[in-house]
UniProtKB/Swiss-Prot annotation:
Pfam families: FMN_red (PF03358). The keyword Nucleotide-binding applies. Keywords: Flavoprotein, FMN, NADP, Nucleotide-binding, Oxidoreductase. The lineage of its organism: Bacteria, Pseudomonadati, Pseudomonadota, Gammaproteobacteria, Enterobacterales. FMN binds at residues 43-50. Homotetramer. SUPFAM superfamilies: Flavoproteins. This is NADPH-dependent FMN reductase ArsH. Gene3D superfamilies: 3.40.50.360. Its cofactor is FMN. Belongs to the ArsH family. Has NADPH-dependent FMN reductase activity and very low azoreductase activity. No activity with NADH. Its EC number is 1.-.-.-.
Length: 255
């Protein structure tokens, strides 16, 4: 499995738990299993700050009641490099995306844009394959790390890509400036407003994912696709047709 092992998953030294809601989605949706979140990062360096930021996000997500998986892209081929996408890393990435109900994308900003490592992962996720939609209807949180001053070029691009992949990108986002100053020697993020923003984003992602989950099929049901597939609407069973159909007046109002 190409999954990153998350060290110290329950250790949150930068989080003041006296202000943290441990299950922020309670009451927003029917009680259900933990929301499933896939996290992607955009650098293969041994001390990758996008990976370290994603690991902090995963710890917070687990504290907030989510189930997380972090994909390791270290042996992912370039798009179109392998015939018919027949590569175990590609297959595993797609399976993880299908498993997910929400995702976190975190890229370094390099030359004003996301990295090729980040883009390659997204490019390996088709809108549809054999009737399966690996990204459509999922929620998405976007993050970036920068070596210099704070910027938003990468998160803006990730938002654009999320819309292209027909995902529901949440309003909040995280951009960490001078990321090399924000992590200690052990790779843990120091307490800071940047860490607090990641906590905000993950809390919001859990809530939005819980809200969207029961309605994902309805939210991605499209006229053009029904038309192309020849799926004719049966007005006798279609709930929307029943709801807007003229209703007979009660006898007291017709007499």
């Amino acid at each position: 499995m190409r999954l990153r092992h998350l060290s110290d998953p329950d250790s949150l030294p930068a989080l003041d738990k006296s202000f943290a809601i441990e299950r922020p989605a309670l009451g927003l949706a029917p009680d259900a299993p933990p929301v499933r979140i896939l996290l992607l990062y955009g650098s293969l360096r041994a001390r990758s700050f996008s990976r370290l930021a994603v690991e902090e996000a995963a710890r917070l997500l687990q504290f907030f009641g989510a189930e997380t998986r972090i994909f390791d892209p270290s042996d992912l081929p370039l798009p179109d490099q392998v015939q018919s996408d027949d590569h175990p890393a590609v297959k595993e990435l797609r399976a993880l995306s299908e498993w997910s109900e929400g995702q976190v994308w975190c890229s370094p900003e390099r030359h004003g844009q996301i990295t090729s490592v980040m883009k390659a992962q997204i490019d390996h996720l088709p809108l549809e394959m054999a009737g399966i939609r690996p990204t459509q209807g999922r929620t998405l949180a976007v993050m970036q790390v920068s070596g210099g001053s704070q910027s938003f070029n990468a998160v803006n691009t990730l938002r654009l890509l999320g819309r292209w992949m027909r995902m529901f990108t949440i309003p909040n986002q995280s951009s960490i400036a001078k990321a090399f100053q924000e992590f200690d020697a052990a790779g843990r993020m120091k307490p800071s407003p940047y860490y607090d923003r990641i906590a905000d984003v993950m809390e919001e992602l859990v809530r939005f994912t819980a809200l969207v989950r029961p309605h994902r099929e309805a939210l991605t049901d499209r006229y053009s696709e029904r038309k192309a597939a020849g799926h004719v609407i049966d007005e006798a069973t279609d709930l929307s047709s029943i709801a807007i159909a003229p209703q007979p007046l009660p006898e007291s109002e017709t007499s």
